[in-house]
From Swiss-Prot:
Lineage: Bacteria, Pseudomonadati, Pseudomonadota, Alphaproteobacteria, Rickettsiales
Subunit structure as annotated in this protein's UniProt entry: Part of the 50S ribosomal subunit.
UniProt key word rRNA-binding: yes
Gene of this entry: rplX
Family recorded in the similarity comment: Belongs to the universal ribosomal protein uL24 family.
Keyword Oxidoreductase: no
Protein name: Large ribosomal subunit protein uL24
Keywords attached to this entry: Ribonucleoprotein, Ribosomal protein, RNA-binding, rRNA-binding
SUPFAM superfamilies: Translation proteins SH3-like domain
Pfam families referenced in this protein's UniProt entry, alphabetically: KOW, ribosomal_L24
PANTHER family: MITOCHONDRIAL RIBOSOMAL PROTEIN L24
GO cellular component: ribonucleoprotein complex; ribosome
Molecular function terms, GO-annotated: rRNA binding; structural constituent of ribosome
Length: 113
């Protein structure tokens, strides 16, 4: 299993495939499958049967995409970047954009800096 450097709410860009160049927010992360769901990317149509709670029909929803096909967006430059981990003076661990050194977010409590 790969250590995921992406969290829910991160801004990412698709780097390969049909949706190459599209930007979006991470809606959901599946660490077991190494996949993420990105808003507006990898849309599929799903046919649903009618039941007591909802009526049937065709709905469009996002499908998971492999993490190797995405890259973080550097908050300073807006370009794709790799992510590194760094410890601050107070001992907290943060995710940092490798290109600019800008802090992307803290590790552990999902709080944006």
């Amino acid at each position: 299993m790969i250590k995921l450097k992406v969290k829910k709410g991160d801004e990412v860009v698709i780097i390969t495939g049909k949706y190459k160049g599209k930007k979006g927010k991470v809606l959901k992360v599946f660490p077991e499958e190494n996949t993420v769901v990105v808003s507006g990317v990898n849309l599929v149509k799903k046919h649903t049967k009618p039941n007591k709670m909802s009526e049937g029909g065709i709905i469009t929803q996002e499908s998971p995409i492999h993490i190797s096909n995405i890259a973080h967006i550097d908050p300073k430059t807006g370009n794709p970047t790799k992510v590194a981990f760094k410890f601050l003076e107070d001992g907290s661990k943060v995710r940092v954009a490798k290109k600019s050194g800008e802090i992307i977010g803290k590790v552990g409590n999902n709080v944006k800096v």
